[in-house]
Amino acid sequence: MEHKDNSKMYGTTILCIRRNNHVIIAGDGQVSLGHTVMKNSAKKVKRLANDTVITGFAGATADAFTLFERLEGKLEKHPGQLLRACVELAKDWRMDRYLRRLEAMMIVADKSVSLVISGNGDVLEPENGIAAIGSGGNYALAAAKALCESNDKFSQNMTLEYIVTTAMNIAAEICIYTNNNIIMEKIED
């Protein structure tokens, strides 16, 4: 995500992997203000809806908290219907003048679906169960895909936690807006 305003606090890399009836969303802990690291231990991954939904954000921190609140409201209105709640949030995001200015993206997941909600109000389900957002998102995504799609016996025995941690650490080595203080939330069936 491009940082348009150096006076806003940004949070960056979020990775979601769904594999073998488990889903993990992980986020790094770095918050940047312009080119300065303001915090190394921010929690950008949260549980919502009585711990049945996990979500992570990248982008302007204050904007992301606004979206968390809106999503919580939609989940209360549509319990157990994550896709519908996200589509309703996206509609509001596209139509509301204030929300359209928010600079954030989210990944949300429950036991059955993972979704990316973009800053344009799009709701996308990743094809292969792997999604990443933020400035280090492409690095984390590439590393996660390589680890998940490898066919040797070693990779088949890797835990989901190992894959997520390794991919996030690779992103942290490459992206200056990402650190290796990784926080994960997991839902298992």
Curated annotation (Swiss-Prot):
Enzyme Commission code(s) on record: 3.4.25.2
Q: Where in the cell is it found?
A: Cytoplasm
Please give the superkingdom of this protein's source: Bacteria
Family named by the database record: Belongs to the peptidase T1B family. HslV subfamily.
Q: Which reaction does it catalyse?
A: ATP-dependent cleavage of peptide bonds with broad specificity
What do we know about how this protein assembles, alone or with others? Answer: A double ring-shaped homohexamer of HslV is capped on each side by a ring-shaped HslU homohexamer. The assembly of the HslU/HslV complex is dependent on binding of ATP.
Output the Gene Ontology terms for molecular function: metal ion binding; threonine-type endopeptidase activity
Entry keyword annotation includes GTP-binding: no
In the UniProt record, does the keyword Methyltransferase occur?
A: no
Q: How is its activity regulated?
A: Allosterically activated by HslU binding.
- Tell me the protein's name: ATP-dependent protease subunit HslV
GO cellular component, alphabetical, reads: HslUV protease complex; proteasome core complex
Q: Cite the active-site annotation.
A: T12
Which residues are Na(+)-binding? A172, C175, T178
Please describe what this protein does.
Answer: Protease subunit of a proteasome-like degradation complex believed to be a general protein degrading machinery.
GO BP terms in the entry:
proteolysis involved in protein catabolic process
For this protein, the record's PANTHER family field holds: ATP-DEPENDENT PROTEASE SUBUNIT HSLV, METALLOPROTEASE TLDD
Q: Which UniProt keywords apply?
A: Allosteric enzyme, Cytoplasm, Hydrolase, Metal-binding, Protease, Sodium, Threonine protease
